[in-house]
């Protein structure tokens, strides 16, 4: 009788040990599954956060580009151009592809239009008494600007060596683009006229390169009218 009781007790203890082992295994599996699920969720959240960060960085650049894609120059223009370029340079290649605004796109800074160093903005002082101001609409394509606009200016300088040839663009949008992207500063009409006055120019000949009589041609003449009392034009 005592031997049978011992056998029953041993069997019960063995069963309990097996159940404990099964429960421990189940608990470990559940814990492993929960940890795996948490890791997956964290990875997904990190991926979403990374995508959002990329989009925000690209949108910031797009907003900065749109802010300088304007026809009016202000006291903040130089700083805005510098800020837009710095923000663009800080983007990754993938982020640059996401830049999209009202006017902004990856080509604003990313497109290769030629070597800007081959151009001459002709915005130097020491003009002298006689100035020949070449006024163009302008272009942000570096190779074209160096070949066409600079070509005209160089030809005029060669033909009139006693006159100082200077440049002005009527499209502030283009001036801002070239300045922001290439660091080349080109005078607008007001800057060019103020430069002439500051340099004591007495005789100013204005040579437009516009192909037609449009709004910016009229704006050029309106600007010249403001300086008639200061310079012989």
Q: Regions from the language model: what does each represent?
A:
Residues 48-110:
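Beta-rich interaction/scaffold domains
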Residues 163-181:
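Short connector loops at secondary-structure junctions
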Residues 24-25:
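C-terminal motif of bacterial Sec signal peptides marking the signal peptidase cleavage site
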Residues 14-21:
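Bacterial N-terminal signal peptides
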Residues 182-195:
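Glycine-rich, highly charged phosphate/nucleotide-binding loops
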Residues 31-56, 108-122:
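N-terminal, intrinsically disordered, polar/charged segments of Gram-positive cell-envelope systems
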Residues 231-233:
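Conserved small/polar residues in nucleotide/adenosyl-binding loops
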Residues 1-10:
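Bacterial Sec-dependent N-terminal signal peptides
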């Amino acid at each position: 009788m005592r031997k049978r009781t011992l056998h029953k007790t041993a069997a019960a203890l063995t069963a309990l040990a097996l159940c404990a082992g099964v429960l421990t295994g189940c608990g470990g599996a559940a814990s492993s599954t929960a940890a795996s699920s948490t890791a997956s969720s964290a990875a997904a959240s990190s991926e979403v956060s990374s995508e959002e960060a990329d989009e925000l960085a690209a949108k910031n650049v797009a907003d900065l580009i749109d802010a300088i894609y304007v026809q009016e120059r202000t006291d903040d223009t130089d700083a805005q151009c510098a800020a837009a370029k710095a923000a663009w340079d800080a983007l990754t290649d993938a982020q640059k592809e996401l830049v999209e605004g009202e006017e902004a796109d990856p080509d604003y800074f990313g497109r290769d239009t030629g070597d800007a160093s081959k151009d001459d903005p002709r915005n130097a002082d020491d003009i002298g008494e006689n100035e020949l101001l070449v006024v163009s609409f302008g272009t942000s394509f570096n190779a074209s600007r160096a070949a066409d606009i600079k070509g005209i200016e160089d030809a005029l300088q060669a033909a009139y060596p006693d006159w100082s040839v200077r440049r002005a663009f009527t499209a502030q949008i283009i001036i801002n683009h070239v300045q922001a992207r290439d660091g080349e500063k080109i005078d607008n009409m007001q800057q060019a006229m103020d430069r002439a006055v500051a340099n004591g120019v007495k005789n100013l000949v204005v040579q437009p390169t516009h192909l037609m009589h449009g709004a910016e041609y009229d704006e050029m003449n309106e600007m010249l009218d403001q300086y008639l009392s200061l310079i012989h034009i």
